[in-house]
Amino acid sequence: TLLRSAAGQLPLLGGAVEVDGRDAASFQRREFARAVSFMPQIRSVPDIDVYALVCHGRFPHLGLSRHMTAADREAVELAMERTGVAAWRERNLRELSGGERQRVYIAMALCQESGNLLLDEPSAWLDAPRQFELLELLKSLAGQGKTVVLVLHELAQAMAYADKIALLSGGELRAALPPAELFASGL
């Protein structure tokens, strides 16, 4: 619910969301999608091949003709390579396992090339090696200046990879601290 609200998919009950210092409500839809990539925890499984689905991440960058440029195709290829799904380009999404689908949706979010990634349970459905690869990739993107916000229920993953952890309980923010400080606080 928190990430869906931040992504503008649910109305806020209070407060405001800012993206890069600007009120999120002031963005046009495509403009917001160029600034923020959102991957919800629960997604549909359309009857579509992997390449076509990943291409949907380029929507905010396409002009009126909706034709992809060489730069768009390059962004799709890079995202597919980074997530290890390039070999599945012609496979139907419905033929893939849950973990494989998860990687395809992550590729779609990455090829959007926004400065801010909101990912709800991105490591769900992934086996341990793929979880590690994903978290390393996201840490690398954060190191390159992207804002990466994850919902994780695995505290060990959050402690190992997060720069800051927000601890929520009963809909209330209990703390937002670097991992070592959160651990030392005893919360």
Predicted segment positions?
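Helix-to-loop junction immediately C-terminal to a conserved catalytic motif
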Residues: 7
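Conserved ABC transporter NBD signature motif
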Residues: 12-23, 32
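ABC ATPase NBD coupling module
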Residues: 23-37, 65-69
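Conserved ABC ATPase "signature" region
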Residues: 55, 70-88, 113
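Conserved ABC ATPase signature
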Residues: 67, 92-96
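Catalytic Walker B motif of ABC-type/P-loop ATPase nucleotide-binding domains
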Residues: 117-121
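Conserved ABC ATPase "signature" C-loop
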Residues: 170-171
